[in-house]
Structures are given as structure tokens and as C-alpha cells.
Amino acid sequence: MAKTFKFIFYFWGAFVLVFALDQWVKSLTLAGLRWQSKYLDLTYALNTGVAFSMLSFLEHNLKYLHLALIGVLFIYLFWQKTLLKTHSIAFGMMLGAGVSNLLDRFIYGGVVDMFFWHKWFNFAIFNVADVMINISVALILIQEIFKKRKKDDRMD
């Protein structure tokens, strides 16, 4: 029972922290906070698509696709408890970020983005949730690589 509580605590803790951080930075952005530097600007953009504004032609229907994908991932993770136990923090981060962006779609009609990297090349404008999704995917990959190596070492 204690182990079950532990992974659920990690999952929801990561979920809430990422969701709250992303929404807080977005609220500062919407309140007018702007900043410029040589490398990174804090600005405002409303992305009606997904990464790099892809699928923006779906307009308001994109939020329902986003909702369905998050719902399927939630159901799958709670059905596949082993996967959730192994990657509870990473999936908590991923889903907290996804739900935060989904909330934006329902409230603002798109996702609030604010970070613009422009040193050496102009990158797409992104937000905290986007960064957290990338970090969570990297965590899952790293955990899987080390898990496989550990398994291979035991077989030798």
C-alpha cells in the first residue's frame, strides 16, 4: 500500500507543480510582463495550433482532439500501472503540462506562449509546459535506457 501511495503522490505532485508553474508564468505574460535579452525574449503569442502552429486549420476543434489524447493517456496509464509506477514523475510532468495547455485552449482559444529564443537561429515561441513535456520525454528515455542496461548487466 505504501508503494502505491508513493507513486501516486509523485505523479500528482509533479502534475500540480508543472500545471501551477506554467499557469503562473502565463498569468504574468497575460498581465503584460515582457523582457528582452541577447538570447531569449519574454513576449506574448497565442498559438492556435500545436508545435510550430501545425494543425491550426482545425481551429476550435483542436481542443477536443487535445482533450481526447490526454484522456486516452490518463486511462492507459491508470490501466498500465507498471508504466505509471516506473515513470510517475515524468508522466505527472507531461500530463500537468498537457492539461495546462488544454485549459488555455478552452479559455483563450489557443495556447499562451512566451519564450522566444533568437540567438544563432530563430526558434518557435514556446512556454513552460512545452519545456516540461520535453524534459518528461527525456526522463522516460533515460530511465528506459538505464533499466535496459541494468537488465543486460544482470544477464551477463
Swiss-Prot record:
Its main location: membrane. It comes from the Bacteria. Pfam families: Peptidase_A8. The keyword Cell inner membrane applies. It catalyses: Release of signal peptides from bacterial membrane prolipoproteins. Hydrolyzes -Xaa-Yaa-Zaa-|-(S,diacylglyceryl)Cys-, in which Xaa is hydrophobic (preferably Leu), and Yaa (Ala or Ser) and Zaa (Gly or Ala) have small, neutral side chains. The chain crosses the membrane at residues 5-25, 64-84, 89-109, 122-142. GO terms for molecular function: aspartic-type endopeptidase activity. It is found in: Cell inner membrane. InterPro entries: Peptidase_A8 (IPR001872). Keywords: Aspartyl protease, Cell inner membrane, Cell membrane, Hydrolase, Membrane, Protease, Transmembrane, Transmembrane helix. GO terms for biological process: proteolysis. Its EC number is 3.4.23.36. Belongs to the peptidase A8 family. This is Lipoprotein signal peptidase. It comes from Campylobacter jejuni subsp. doylei (strain ATCC BAA-1458 / RM4099 / 269.97). The lineage of its organism: Bacteria, Pseudomonadati, Campylobacterota, Epsilonproteobacteria, Campylobacterales.
